[in-house]
């Protein structure tokens, strides 16, 4: 069976996963916010809000991982892991919903109503990149949520 201990809180693997979540979520926010007209579409605003929450949650846990690695403290107790499970599942579900809704709007724009062809000033490429980055952030977040759930089940 695959070992989840390497990815638990307070380890280098856990820190790497959190840094990846922050990086992809932050990049998604930056790319989406740099596209003119994103604020006219609710799904894109929701994506930015969701990725902002994902960034804050993951940054906080990354800082906690750095602290635990610095002082060599074990974060493997039931109360902390329970908190991580709840936070990870909430942010993973919100990230997935935001990524899917923004992705759906992009499919509508590009393939169904051909907005991207009719309005070349609309930065569809940036919007698509932001959605792809959000999905990558969600993938790491969902992985973290599953690992935390497995760790909680082991108590």
Curated annotation (Swiss-Prot):
Report the principal subcellular site.
membrane
Q: Which residues cross the membrane?
A: 19-39, 44-64, 78-98, 129-149
Record's InterPro entries? CASP_dom (IPR006702), CASPL-5 (IPR045009)
Q: Does the keyword Amino-acid biosynthesis apply?
A: no
Give the membrane topology, semicolon-separated if more than one.
Multi-pass membrane protein
The places in or outside the cell where this protein is found are: Cell membrane
Domain of life of the organism in this record? Eukaryota
* Positions in the Extracellular compartment: 40-43, 99-128
> How does the annotation summarize its subunit structure?
Homodimer and heterodimers.
> What is the protein name stated in its UniProt record?
CASP-like protein 5B2
Q: Which organism is it from?
A: Oryza sativa subsp. japonica
Per the UniProt record, the lineage of the source organism begins with:
Eukaryota, Viridiplantae, Streptophyta, Embryophyta, Tracheophyta
């Amino acid at each position: 069976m695959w070992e989840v201990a390497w990815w638990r809180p307070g380890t280098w693997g856990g820190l790497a996963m959190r840094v990846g979540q922050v990086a992809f979520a932050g990049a998604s926010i930056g790319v989406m916010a740099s596209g003119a007209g994103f604020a006219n579409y609710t799904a894109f605003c929701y994506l930015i809000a969701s990725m902002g929450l994902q960034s804050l949650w993951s940054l906080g846990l990354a800082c906690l991982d750095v602290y635990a690695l610095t002082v060599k403290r074990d974060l493997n107790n039931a109360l902390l892991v329970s908190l991580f499970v709840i936070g990870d599942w909430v942010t993973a579900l919100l990230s997935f919903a935001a990524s899917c809704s923004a992705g759906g709007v992009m499919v509508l724009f590009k393939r169904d109503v051909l907005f991207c062809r009719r309005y070349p000033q609309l930065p569809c490429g940036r919007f698509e990149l932001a959605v792809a980055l959000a999905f990558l952030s969600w993938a790491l977040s969902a992985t973290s949520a599953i690992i935390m759930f497995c760790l909680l089940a082991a108590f």
